[in-house]
């Protein structure tokens, strides 16, 4: 019963993030705690932030899903359905990571900045906008994965190779 409630709570939280706009929500939260300075990814005293297995699993699944679609995306042959399916995979993994997060508070705060970029990219890919906007959404996902590699310790991480 507790697991079902936890799943429902995580799903509701993700839906709220998506409907309100994660970037605005995070920016507002950061603004209220730090005098209006924008939230920014930083290292943990010069070191990458620790990760847990759930985070590594979710980020690897996002990377793998994107890599599988890159030939079609770069060839301008990705259909709206392909973009939408990729966006769903990304949102599913973001929900999984949010539901199963075991990071300390500071690492979690940094992770939310990466998740914000992932959600923004997924939103652009699943929207009713042009293929150019969908392509730009995929670029946001690539950028988020690059930042993840810079700021988080994920042993064996292989980034996305963009042509």
Question: How should each PLM-predicted stretch be described?
Answer:
Residues 100, 111-163:
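Helix-rich interaction surfaces within compact, conserved domain-sized segments
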């Amino acid at each position: 019963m507790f697991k079902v409630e936890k799943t429902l709570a995580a799903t509701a939280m993700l839906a709220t993030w998506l409907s309100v706009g994660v970037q605005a929500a995070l920016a507002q939260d950061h603004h209220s705690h730090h005098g209006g300075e924008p939230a920014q990814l930083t290292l943990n005293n010069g070191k990458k932030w620790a990760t847990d297995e759930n985070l590594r699993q979710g980020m690897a699944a996002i990377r793998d899903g994107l890599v599988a679609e890159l030939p079609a995306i770069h060839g301008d042959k990705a259909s709206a359905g392909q973009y939408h399916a990729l966006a769903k995979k990304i949102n599913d993994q973001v929900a999984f990571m949010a539901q199963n997060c075991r990071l300390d508070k500071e690492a979690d705060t940094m992770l939310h900045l990466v998740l914000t970029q992932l959600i923004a990219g997924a939103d652009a890919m699943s929207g009713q906008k042009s293929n150019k906007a969908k392509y730009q959404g995929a670029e946001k996902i690539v950028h988020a994965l690059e930042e993840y590699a810079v700021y988080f310790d994920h042993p064996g991480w292989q980034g996305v190779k963009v042509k």
